[in-house]
C-alpha cells in the first residue's frame, strides 16, 4: 500500500504495463463505442453540454475515470462538429511524490496536457480534521477545483 499523503489516506497503486496510446484511442471509438463513446456523445447532445465557443475544464484526479473523461473530450474535440476549447487541470493537495509522479507519467503517456497546481489541502486537513478528514477534504478539493476552473 502507498500513502496518498496526509494521515487518513491510503490507496493501492496498481503498477501494470501501459497499452500503446494509439491502441487506447482506437479502443474508445471502436471496442468501447457502444458502452462508452456512444453514451458520452448522447449525454453531450441530449443535455447540450458542449456548445460553440465553450471553454471546458476537465478535472483529473489521476484515476481511470477522470483519465477516460479526458480522452473522451480529446476525441470529441478531434472528431466533433462543435468548436470548443478544453483544458485539463489537476490539483496536488499534497500528494506523496510517487503519486504525483504517477499522475504526470499517465498524463504524458496518454498525451493529456495537464496543468497541475498546488493547494496544500492535506496539510490543512491534518490540522483541522484529523479524526474525520474525508468530508472536509472532499469539500475543499471541490471548492478549489471550481475556483480554478473559473
Labelled PLM ranges:
Residues 3-150:
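ATP-dependent adenylation/nucleotidyltransferase module used to activate substrates
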Amino acid at each position: 500500500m502507498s500513502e496518498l499523503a496526509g494521515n487518513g489516506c491510503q490507496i493501492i497503486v496498481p503498477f501494470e504495463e501501459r497499452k500503446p496510446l494509439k491502441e487506447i484511442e482506437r479502443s474508445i471509438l471502436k471496442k468501447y463505442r457502444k458502452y462508452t463513446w456512444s453514451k458520452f456523445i448522447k449525454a453531450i447532445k441530449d443535455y447540450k453540454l458542449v456548445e460553440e465557443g465553450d471553454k471546458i475544464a476537465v478535472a483529473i484526479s489521476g484515476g481511470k475515470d477522470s483519465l477516460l473523461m479526458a480522452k473522451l473530450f480529446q476525441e470529441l474535440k478531434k472528431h466533433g462538429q462543435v468548436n470548443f476549447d478544453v483544458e485539463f487541470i489537476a490539483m496536488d493537495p499534497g500528494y506523496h511524490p510517487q503519486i504525483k509522479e504517477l499522475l504526470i507519467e499517465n498524463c504524458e503517456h496518454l498525451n493529456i496536457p495537464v496543468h497541475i497546481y498546488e493547494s496544500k489541502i492535506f496539510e490543512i486537513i491534518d490540522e483541522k480534521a484529523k479524526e474525520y478528514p474525508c468530508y472536509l477534504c472532499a469539500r475543499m478539493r471541490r471548492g478549489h477545483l471550481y475556483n480554478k476552473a473559473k
